[in-house]
Amino acid sequence: MTTTKTHLCHYDQPLYHVGDMNGKPWPTSSMEGPLLSCSPYPEDWRAIARLGQAPIWTLQRLDGKPPKLVNFQRLSRSDKKRWLAKAQELDLIHSATLYKAQAGDDDQYTICLTLEEARQESESWVKPTKGWLPKPALNKFWYGSEKENISPFFAMDAAFTFLAKQIPGIDGIWWDDSYDPGNLSAPRVGIFPEKVKRLRRMHKIILLG
């Protein structure tokens, strides 16, 4: 895929995974889907994701370099258009009219598939919006099954994750969310499963080059 490189970055902060690492693939119920969830703030992430007493694993590359990640927030407008066009070409997503429904504060909202659902979710404002819905191929990538549907809230991110995985040398995705643990928000990283090797005794996760 032809694209600029402003969205490619080396993540030079320490990263941690909070979880048991009992199997592979790991559960796909998180916002990172099939990717291994990591964060520079493990204890905050433990609270946000309600992970209880799960152990903490440190993450490092085999060559000692920082992980190389894609940051979607740094994609230019023209790159986003190209990525969306590619995702549609690959039959990963399709456009749809969705509905924003206020949830909590005035600037917080949820995305609903129908106007009726949106009105049930909110007694305040409801607005139509252009959005994206997953197609079976994207559901299979994200969940391992076409029967589960990705939320419209995450469909574009899931499609971009699929595309980012095709870029040579990339270890995963960086979601540069605001650090606000009180509102269940913190920066997070998803590592592609193929990059992962575990060292159980040292509680380390090694990313293969």
Predicted regions and their residues:
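Active-site and NAD+-binding cores of ADP-ribose-processing enzymes
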Residues: 2-37, 42, 46-209
